[in-house]
């Protein structure tokens, strides 16, 4: 699927739309991330990778890295950098790694909230969001009407 950009709510250019420690502003995601961070990571990775990585694959790889090394934050901090680059959010790789190392859950929930704030329905995945956007565009715009029929 080709890359689509959803309409985002306005916020300061170059800034995260929510704070790093605003985990409880979305209690459902906060609980899911606390008990199973691989789910939140998988959802974020699928959107950031624009569907080239599935939620299940990214989440399973995250869980495997966490079980084998205990350092899944190394994997997830790359996605924070990738997301910052896509949305022109201020920051640097060193700070990304520090945030993921010191508070992985806060980092993951902030990324999740950012994508949600930018118009993504995280439960739909990339393909579902693209389809939703196309359906909304199709309904709002409607089919063009031609007057006069065919002529030579």
UniProtKB/Swiss-Prot annotation:
Keyword Transport among UniProt keywords? no
What are the subcellular locations of this protein? Answer: Cell membrane
> How is it placed in the membrane, per its record?
Single-pass membrane protein
Q: Which residues lie in coiled coils?
A: none
Which phenotype arises from disrupting this gene? Strongly impaired growth in the presence of heavy metals such as zinc, cadmium, copper or iron.
- For this protein, the parts annotated as crossing the membrane are 57-79
Q: What induces it?
A: Constitutively expressed. Up-regulated in the shoots by cadmium. Down-regulated under zinc deficiency.
Mind telling me which InterPro entries this protein's record contains?
PLAC_motif_containing
Q: Does the keyword Transmembrane helix apply?
A: yes
- Keyword terms, alphabetized: Cell membrane, Membrane, Transmembrane, Transmembrane helix
Provide a GO CC annotation, any one: plasma membrane
Regarding tissue, the record states:
Expressed in roots, leaves, shoots, stems, flowers and siliques. In leaves, restricted mainly to the vascular tissue. Expressed in all cells in the root tip, in the vascular tissue and the epidermis in the elongation zone, and only in the epidermal cells in the root hair zone.
Q: GO biological process annotations for this chain's record?
A: response to oxidative stress
What role is this protein assigned? Zinc transporter acting in both zinc extrusion and long-distance zinc transport. Involved in the loading of zinc into the xyleme and in the detoxification of excess zinc at the epidermal cells. Acts independently from the zinc transporters HMA2 and HMA4. May be also involved in cadmium resistance.
Family classification: Belongs to the cornifelin family.
Q: Could you describe the subunit structure of this protein?
A: Homooligomer.
Protein known as:
Protein PLANT CADMIUM RESISTANCE 2
Q: Which organism is it from?
A: Arabidopsis thaliana (Mouse-ear cress)
The beginning of the lineage is: Eukaryota, Viridiplantae, Streptophyta, Embryophyta, Tracheophyta
């Amino acid at each position: 699927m080709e890359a689509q950009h959803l309409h985002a709510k306005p916020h300061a250019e170059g800034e995260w739309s929510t704070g790093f420690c605003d985990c409880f502003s979305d209690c459902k995601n906060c609980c899911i991330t606390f008990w199973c961070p691989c789910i939140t990571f998988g959802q974020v990775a699928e959107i950031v990778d624009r569907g080239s990585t599935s939620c299940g694959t990214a989440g399973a790889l995250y869980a495997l890295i966490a079980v084998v090394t205990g350092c899944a934050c190394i994997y997830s901090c790359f996605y924070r950098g990738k997301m910052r680059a896509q949305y022109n959010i201020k920051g640097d790789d060193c700070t990304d790694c520090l945030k993921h190392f010191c508070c992985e859950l806060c980092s993951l929930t902030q990324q999740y909230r950012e994508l949600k704030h930018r118009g993504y329905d995280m439960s739909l995945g990339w393909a579902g969001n693209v389809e939703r956007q196309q359906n909304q565009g199709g309904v709002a715009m409607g089919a063009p009407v031609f007057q006069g029929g065919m002529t030579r």
